[in-house]
Structures are given as structure tokens and as C-alpha cells.
């Protein structure tokens, strides 16, 4: 949905022709005018009951024109992964940071990875893994960057039997390679 700045109305905007339907993808701001959408899992026709694939692509959405552009795709490696809710883009250092985790097991883990923002190349793993109970819609993880404290924060949440288990992890920024 988009809201008019001059009128009090909303308009539906569809990106399904430009970005294949997906979930378990990450999004974040590249700058004031650009939202990035990275990776995920879904079906190109939007019919997940027919099977899903993991996506390793990055899209940019201009929030002024609502135009979408595919920036890159990295080759599917043997270690399938999906992305936490938020991604962090560092234009100055040409890096895209994401919490990544395998979506094919429930006793999973999260790993902070970076990719070159302009190409998707030079995938780098950071720090150690974080234990993560993955149960589709009952769990999520997200990444935040605090520029004042120069910290990255990874937040995990797992809901089970009407109870939530929430964990917060911090890491100095910029992160060090493993």
C-alpha cells in the first residue's frame, strides 16, 4: 500500500510482476529513497503448495517512483539459507549484512553474513552461530544497526504454547571476520 502525501487515501501497489512472491526475506533501507529486498523462499507463481525454492537475489525499490530493479542474484550454493526480517546496508563500505539461517530444519542456527552491496560477491561469515529454533511462522529473527553505539543487534523470537522466548545479541560494528 502507498499513501498519498497530499490526500488522505491509500492505493494498492503490486510488485509481484517484478519480485516473485516470497517470504523469509529481509528488507532494509539503502538510503532515504531506496528500500532493498533480499532473498527469501517462495514459488515463482505464488503457489507454495506446488513447492518452494530459495531466492538469493537483491531488489531495489525506489520509494518515490515505486519502480523496482533487480540488482543481482548470487548462485545457489549447497548450503540453502533464508534471511532474517531486516537487512543492514552500508553504502560507504559497499556491504549488505543479513542474518541467514537454514530453513530445512527446526533445530537451526543464525549466522551473520555480508555480501558486496553492488554485486553480491564476497560472501563473508562473521562471529559465531546463534542457536535458533525455526518453526516457520512461530519464529523470526531480525537485525538492527545502532549507529550511535556502533552496534549490530540480532533479535530472535520463538513462540510456543502462547509463550515467547526472546533473545537479544549484540556485536560491535563493523564486525570482525571469523
Say what each PLM segment does.
Residues 1-54:
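N-terminal pre-first-transmembrane soluble regions of secretory-pathway and organelle membrane proteins
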Residues 1-9, 50-67, 107-122, 164-178:
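Beta-propeller blade signature
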Residues 29-33, 89-93, 145-149:
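Residue-level detector of Asp-centered blade-edge/turn motifs that repeat once per structural unit
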Residues 35-37, 96, 152:
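Hydrophobic beta-strand positions that form the internal "hydrophobic ladder"
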Residues 67-85, 118-148, 177:
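Conserved blade-ending motifs and adjacent loop-strand segments that build the rim/top face
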Amino acid at each position: 500500500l502507498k499513501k498519498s502525501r497530499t490526500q488522505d487515501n491509500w492505493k494498492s501497489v503490486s510488485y509481484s510482476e517484478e519480485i516473485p512472491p516470497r517470504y523469509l526475506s529481509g528488507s532494509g533501507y539503502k538510503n532515504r529513497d531506496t528500500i532493498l529486498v533480499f532473498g527469501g523462499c517462495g514459488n515463482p507463481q505464488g503457489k507454495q503448495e506446488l513447492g518452494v525454492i530459495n531466492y538469493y537475489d537483491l531488489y531495489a525499490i525506489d520509494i518515490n517512483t515505486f519502480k523496482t530493479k533487480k540488482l543481482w542474484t548470487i548462485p545457489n550454493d549447497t548450503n540453502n539459507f533464508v534471511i532474517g526480517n531486516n537487512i543492514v546496508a552500508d553504502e560507504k563500505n559497499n556491504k549488505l549484512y543479513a542474518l541467514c539461517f537454514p530453513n530445512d530444519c527446526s533445530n537451526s542456527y543464525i549466522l551473520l553474513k555480508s555480501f558486496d552491496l553492488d554485486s553480491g560477491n564476497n560472501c563473508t561469515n562473521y562471529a559465531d552461530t546463534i542457536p535458533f529454533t525455526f518453526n516457520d511462522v512461530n519464529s523470526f529473527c531480525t537485525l538492527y544497526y545502532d549507529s550511535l553505539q556502533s552496534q549490530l543487534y540480532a533479535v530472535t523470537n520463538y513462540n510456543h504454547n502462547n509463550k515467547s522466548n526472546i533473545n537479544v545479541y549484540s556485536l560491535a560494528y563493523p564486525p570482525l571476520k571469523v
